[in-house]
Swiss-Prot record:
InterPro entries: FAD-dep_OxRdtase (IPR006076), FAD/NAD-bd_sf (IPR036188), MnmC-like_methylTransf (IPR008471), SAM-dependent_MTases_sf (IPR029063), tRNA_MAMT_biosynth_bifunc_MnmC (IPR023032), tRNA_MNMC2 (IPR047785), tRNA_S-uridine_synth_MnmC_C (IPR017610). Pfam families: DAO, Methyltransf_30. In the N-terminal section; belongs to the methyltransferase superfamily. tRNA (mnm(5)s(2)U34)-methyltransferase family. In the C-terminal section; belongs to the DAO family. It is found in: Cytoplasm. GO terms for molecular function: flavin adenine dinucleotide binding; oxidoreductase activity, acting on the CH-NH group of donors; tRNA (5-methylaminomethyl-2-thiouridylate)(34)-methyltransferase activity. GO terms for biological process: methylation; tRNA wobble uridine modification. The keyword S-adenosyl-L-methionine applies. Residues 1-245 are annotated as: tRNA (mnm(5)s(2)U34)-methyltransferase. Its EC number is 2.1.1.61, 1.5.-.-. Catalyzes the last two steps in the biosynthesis of 5-methylaminomethyl-2-thiouridine (mnm(5)s(2)U) at the wobble position (U34) in tRNA. Catalyzes the FAD-dependent demodification of cmnm(5)s(2)U34 to nm(5)s(2)U34, followed by the transfer of a methyl group from S-adenosyl-L-methionine to nm(5)s(2)U34, to form mnm(5)s(2)U34. This is tRNA 5-methylaminomethyl-2-thiouridine biosynthesis bifunctional protein MnmC. The lineage of its organism: Bacteria, Pseudomonadati, Pseudomonadota, Gammaproteobacteria, Pasteurellales. Residues 272-671 are annotated as: FAD-dependent cmnm(5)s(2)U34 oxidoreductase.
């Protein structure tokens, strides 16, 4: 298996006599020794005529792509300028800036902070960025600063550019063609880059670069750009800028069977749910200016699987498909950002004091060792001896295992209910005791009946867990319910010493303010019952005592109160969620019945048949606290036709039609 997280290398940095940062990998300066900030304004902002373009921009988001993030100075400068624009033109159509950048050798947060000290005017944004800056694997990582979105694609740009995929085709408004000079970094400045740039750029989109090298000019012209020269910055005689012709042909869709549609003009959105999955869809949609109504069938929010008193938040690391690992790590990092944003606004119990993974048998120990070889990041996952793990846990354990220091726990019910209440102050409308049934699409809206009244919305999002399969449109989605019961026990003098979540073939949380712990959880597949089970209650405690059999602190637990929370999780066999536009299974299985031969013969393939204006996020299983923030952001970005914070290969893994498309791609028949 590929060691996916070990492929990222950090920059070797030094400073020259002018205190300008220098890359030792490329033996080149990061920006002009004369004035790096003025160079950024002149070359990239003026070169792309950003201020003028923003004033006449006719959609809500503007997308800039940059070929080398470096010190982040270009980002800070353009983000600051965009904030000025929003202040000066509050009624402008343009509301959000997306800055997409690539970086093969990232600087550390400490190095960035040191360099940024020279630019105190950017102190606030720099502090926000460096606080959550933690490159740990290749691929996209989204950083979110209110109306400004920064997507940094770590790793080799020529590997990452194709992963922007179909959803970025013809989407980029302006390029900052930066990076080290062509003679220092010839691997970047080549035809592959220029062709990718051309297909990703909007008709009429522009680029600007500090160089005037003839190889660059000819390369850009050869793929279709109109290239022009202007005076260079400082001592440079010339620089290049240019545009993609307005009449350029749009690049073909590479994966039509995973095609999804956006709805930029639709503003009125209904979300069906009430738990953590729907929460983050709602949050991201509101941030993107949409009018959102939440419909919940219960008389209160977070009544199902999101209603536990305590739940762990940590990435699911496994020795399975490396794309799954990348997905869960990206989710975890984004979830930490979201928690940091929400924490000052909502009152909920939480403690990011780590999660201990206990090696309760040889098989588990070997699995943890394999994961450690794959991650190679002690801030994410670190093997521990028995003594080290005992210190982390706060109680003695006979075996070692692993520790995830940035992980922890929170109260899902407090978090979900509290954040929904906060979002109501931001325009969210919540309708309880309302079960959406048999929605039908006509005249550009989804309609359904409830208590003799008709309800209508332009877009319908289903984030309703295991009850998704009750909708006729969800035919073919292989979702199944998993009943889970979490036991609640009073604390003991020993358990009060527990410092972090302990995971084994179950989990135990530290003491809550109510002086209780949660022990979870039973796992009963194809069962949607929510009654209390005394058998499962005893099994939860027994599993703890059996897995940590030599630990006397697991004894003496009082389970006589029979306190527990039952929930039904929505799961999928391949253990990754689904997110995207709702596929029309009955049409697609006919549409693609000969897909294998069509691709083999290089014949044209139709775009996938989906239900118009209908979207879904589901299958989060027991990882909703970790995955829901990024999934919600992805779905909102798709709906709004804005950049997605995920690589195309992972997007395909998450596609709602993936199960039957996989079969059809192999030439198998789908019934």
């Amino acid at each position: 298996m590929v060691n996916v997280m070990n492929t990222l290398s950090f920059a070797s940095l030094s400073f020259n006599s002018n205190n300008t940062p220098v890359s030792e990998q490329f033996d080149d300066i990061y920006f002009s020794t004369q004035d790096g900030l003025e160079e950024s304004y002149y070359v990239f902002q003026d070169g792309n005529q950003l201020w003028q373009k923003w004033q006449t921009h006719d959609v809500e988001s503007f997308v800039i792509a940059e070929t080398g993030f470096g010190t982040g100075l270009n980002f800070l400068a353009v983000a600051d300028k965009f904030q000025q624009f929003l202040s000066e033109f509050p009624n402008s159509k343009l509301k959000r800036l997306y800055f997409i950048s690539f970086e093969k050798f990232p600087l550390t947060s400490e190095q960035l902070a040191t360099i940024h000290k020279n630019y105190p005017q950017f102190a606030t944004l720099s502090q926000k960025m460096t606080a959550c800056w933690q490159p740990r694997q290749t691929g996209c990582q989204r950083y979110h600063f209110e109306q400004i979105y920064l997507d940094v694609w770590f790793g080799d740009m020529l590997d990452n550019l194709p992963q922007l995929g179909d959803l970025y085709t013809n989407r980029i408004d302006a390029w900052f063609l930066d990076g080290f000079s062509p003679d220092k970094n010839p691997e970047m400045w080549n035809e592959t880059l220029y062709r990718q740039m051309f297909s990703l750029t909007k008709n009429g989109g522009s680029f600007a670069t500090f160089t005037a090298a003839s190889t660059v000019r000819k390369g850009l012209q050869a793929v279709g750009f109109e290239v022009k020269k202007r005076k260079g910055f400082g001592k440079k005689r010339e620089m290049l800028w240019g545009e993609k012709p307005q009449q350029s042909e749009t690049a073909p869709v590479n994966y039509p069977y995973f095609y999804s549609e956006s709805q930029t003009e639709a503003n009125d959105i209904a979300v069906v749910g009430g738990g953590v999955a729907s929460l983050f869809v709602v949050l991201s949609l509101l941030e993107k200016g949409k009018k959102v109504t939440l419909y919940c069938k219960d008389n209160a929010l977070a009544q199902n699987a999101s209603g536990n008193l305590q739940g762990a938040i940590y990435p699911q690391l496994s020795d399975d498909d490396e794309r799954n690992i990348r997905f869960y790590v990206h989710c975890f990092d984004y979830a930490l950002q979201r928690l940091a944003q929400i924490e000052p606004l909502v009152n909920f119990e939480h403690a990011l004091t780590g999660v201990a993974l206990y090696a309760y048998n040889d098989k588990t120990a070997k699995k943890l060792e394999k994961i450690a070889r794959q991650t190679n990041d002690d801030s994410l996952f670190k093997l521990c001896s028995a003594a080290e793990l005992s210190e982390k846990i706060g109680l003695k354990v006979p075996n070692g295992g692993a520790f995830m220091p940035q992980s922890g726990w929170l109260s899902p019910i407090q978090f979900v209910q509290g954040t929904f209440a906060y979002l109501q102050t931001k325009g969210l409308r919540i309708v309880l005791n309302h079960e959406v049934k048999d929605p039908q699409f006509s005249e550009g809206k989804w309609h359904w009946q409830h208590n003799g009244k008709t309800f209508s919305h332009q877009i319908l999002v289903l984030a309703n867990g295991h009850t998704l399969t009750q909708f006729q449109q969800a035919q073919g989605i292989p979702l199944y319910p998993v009943r889970g019961q979490v036991s609640q026990i009073p604390t003991t003098s020993a358990l009060q010493q527990l410092k972090c979540v302990v995971c084994y073939d179950g989990y135990l949380t530290p003491v809550s303010k109510a002086n209780t712990h949660c022990i979870g959880a039973s796992h009963v597949r194809d069962n949607a019952e929510t009654h209390f089970s005394l058998e499962e209650h005893h099994e939860n405690v027994a599993k703890l005592q059996q897995n940590l059999t030599a630990c006397d602190w697991t004894q003496g637990i009082d389970e006589s109160q029979n306190l527990a929370k039952q929930g039904v999780r929505a799961a999928l066999r391949d253990r990754v969620p689904m997110v995207g536009q709702m596929p029309n299974f009955s049409v697609q299985k006919v549409q693609y019945q000969n897909l294998y031969n069509q691709l083999r013969r290089k014949q044209a393939v139709e775009n996938a048949a989906n239900f118009a204006n209908l979207y879904m996020v589901n299958g989060l299983a027991s990882r909703g606290l970790t995955t829901a923030p990024l999934l919600g952001e992805m779905l909102a970005s798709l709906i709004c036709d804005e950049p997605l914070p995920i690589s195309e290969d992972i997007w395909h893994v998450l596609s709602p039609n993936r199960t039957w498309i996989r079969k059809l791609l192999k030439g198998s028949k789908v019934e």
